[in-house]
């Protein structure tokens, strides 16, 4: 029997893979008996931040990661492709239909027993995958800290508001994907210089909610928009509000652009791209309604701040996501030091493959470092002076000296060759 803690992206992926291999799995999920500050449903694999799984281009790092995962029959990608919504060259999903699908597949599997309880004690002698996500409970966090002799596990993260599509003024906003690449999948709210400066001033003077022990420890992928703005007046214009490739229908080039991405199949909800925030709700409404096209915006879900949890993994995990001092324990998902939805799911798949190898062959065959899955495992297990959670990127690979376009194709080819050899060697 294998114990898995957490039915998020990583835990669901690991449970499904192992159950399909014939193992009996006990999957612990404390929701809905005990909720978290960010989750709003009782479903597994709930997406609490964006609804985007990012690029589908296999010559993009996260696109390559998706290709690798399909070789292992990823449940998360299966669900995502069934319940995708238009997003240009990216993969985005209807978050509710997506998580409902994952939940049904897990709950209906004959080898998976779902237990809705908070895990408050851990046994070093049980095969355990800890995939409690970035919102692990205090009691579980304390158990992890005690067994691994840690001082801390916590940092804080923020999520973006969702807008009612009917309240968006399409006389001002317009549909377009950057550089007109693929279908016009984003709603764009353009600003001229004066509008941007007024918006920026309001953003910088908005009041934020922060817990007393907030340490301002955030990573780039989900940094609150107001914190990013504090880096400089033009930081947002070169980040989430960059206008390049988003020329207005009349040919005019905007000074800055706020993008909104479809959040559901019915196109009733749009989330604000890169607009994670922990502003107080009154200020959120005031600042958002200063954006041209959103002057009458109805906010369906306000941005919120919530606690995240992750290990300083290189001190504790090897490249199989296995705890060095407690070999029956594995960590997966954001708690293991990966960043991003697909990365979390991939780590769950990685752990499941490693545990299966350990139980059937008596040893682990880590995925090759020429694959993105293997490169990420190497990252979380190798020494870094300042370890931070990391998403998929080609910088994790052993570098190839070639022109950028050619280099990406070579990375892809090398990964597929390494993966083919790995699978042929027996999983």
Curated annotation (Swiss-Prot):
<dbReference type="InterPro" id="IPR040131">
    <property type="entry name" value="MnmG_N"/>
</dbReference>
<dbReference type="GO" id="GO:0030488">
    <property type="term" value="P:tRNA methylation"/>
</dbReference>
<keyword id="KW-0808">Transferase</keyword>
<dbReference type="InterPro" id="IPR002218">
    <property type="entry name" value="MnmG-rel"/>
</dbReference>
<dbReference type="Pfam" id="PF01134">
    <property type="entry name" value="GIDA"/>
</dbReference>
<dbReference type="GO" id="GO:0050660">
    <property type="term" value="F:flavin adenine dinucleotide binding"/>
</dbReference>
<keyword id="KW-0285">Flavoprotein</keyword>
<dbReference type="InterPro" id="IPR004417">
    <property type="entry name" value="TrmFO"/>
</dbReference>
<protein>
    <recommendedName>
        <fullName>Methylenetetrahydrofolate--tRNA-(uracil-5-)-methyltransferase TrmFO</fullName>
        <ecNumber>2.1.1.74</ecNumber>
    </recommendedName>
</protein>
<keyword id="KW-0274">FAD</keyword>
<comment type="similarity">
    <text>Belongs to the MnmG family. TrmFO subfamily.</text>
</comment>
<keyword id="KW-0489">Methyltransferase</keyword>
<keyword id="KW-0819">tRNA processing</keyword>
<keyword id="KW-0963">Cytoplasm</keyword>
<dbReference type="InterPro" id="IPR036188">
    <property type="entry name" value="FAD/NAD-bd_sf"/>
</dbReference>
<keyword id="KW-0520">NAD</keyword>
<feature type="binding site">
    <location>
        <begin position="6"/>
        <end position="11"/>
    </location>
    <ligand>
        <name>FAD</name>
    </ligand>
</feature>
<comment type="function">
    <text>Catalyzes the folate-dependent formation of 5-methyl-uridine at position 54 (M-5-U54) in all tRNAs.</text>
</comment>
<keyword id="KW-0521">NADP</keyword>
<dbReference type="GO" id="GO:0005829">
    <property type="term" value="C:cytosol"/>
</dbReference>
<dbReference type="GO" id="GO:0002098">
    <property type="term" value="P:tRNA wobble uridine modification"/>
</dbReference>
<dbReference type="GO" id="GO:0047151">
    <property type="term" value="F:tRNA (uracil(54)-C5)-methyltransferase activity, 5,10-methylenetetrahydrofolate-dependent"/>
</dbReference>
């Amino acid at each position: 029997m294998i114990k898995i803690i957490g039915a998020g992206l990583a835990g669901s992926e690991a449970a499904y893979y192992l159950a399909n291999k014939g193992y009996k799995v006990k999957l612990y999920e404390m929701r809905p008996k005990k909720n978290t500050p960010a989750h709003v449903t009782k479903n597994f694999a709930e997406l609490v931040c964006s609804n985007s799984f990012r690029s589908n281009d296999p010559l993009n790092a996260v696109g390559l990661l998706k290709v690798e995962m399909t070789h292992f029959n990823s449940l998360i990608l299966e669900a995502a492709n069934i319940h995708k919504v238009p997003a240009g060259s990216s993969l985005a999903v209807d978050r509710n239909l997506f998580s409902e699908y994952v939940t049904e597949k897990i709950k209906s599997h004959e080898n998976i027993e779902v237990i809705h309880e908070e895990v408050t004690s851990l046994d070093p002698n049980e095969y355990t995958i800890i995939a409690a996500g970035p919102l692990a409970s205090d009691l579980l966090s304390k158990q992890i800290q005690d067994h691994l002799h840690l001082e801390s596990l916590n940092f804080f993260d923020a999520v973006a508001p969702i807008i009612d599509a009917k309240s968006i003024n399409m006389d001002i906003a317009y549909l377009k994907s950057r550089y007109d690449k693929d279908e016009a999948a984003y709603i764009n709210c353009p600003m001229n210089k004066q509008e941007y400066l007024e918006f920026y001033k309001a953003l910088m003077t908005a009041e934020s909610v922060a817990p007393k022990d907030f340490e301002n420890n955030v990573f780039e992928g989900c940094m609150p928009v107001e914190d990013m703005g504090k880096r400089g007046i033009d930081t947002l214009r070169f980040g989430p509000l960059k206008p390049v490739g988003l020329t207005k229908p009349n040919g005019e080039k905007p000074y800055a652009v706020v993008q909104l991405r479809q959040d559901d199949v019915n196109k009733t909800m749009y989330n604000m791209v890169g607009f994670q925030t922990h502003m107080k709700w009154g200020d959120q409404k005031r600042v958002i309604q200063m954006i041209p096209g959103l002057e009458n915006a109805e906010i369906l879900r306000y941005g919120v701040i919530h606690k995240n949890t992750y290990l300083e993994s290189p001190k504790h995990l090897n490249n199989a996501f296995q705890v060095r001092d407690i070999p029956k324990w594995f960590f997966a998902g954001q708690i293991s030091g990966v960043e991003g939805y697909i990365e979390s799911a991939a780590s769950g798949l990685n752990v499941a493959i490693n545990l299966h190898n350990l139980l059937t062959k008596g040893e682990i065959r880590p995925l090759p470092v020429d694959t993105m899955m293997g490169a990420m495992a190497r990252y979380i297990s190798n020494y870094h002076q300042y370890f931070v959670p990391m998403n998929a990127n080609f910088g994790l690979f052993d570098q190839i000296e070639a022109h950028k376009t050619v280099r990406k194709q070579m990375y892809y080819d090398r990964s597929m060759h390494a993966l083919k050899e790995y699978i042929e060697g027996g999983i």
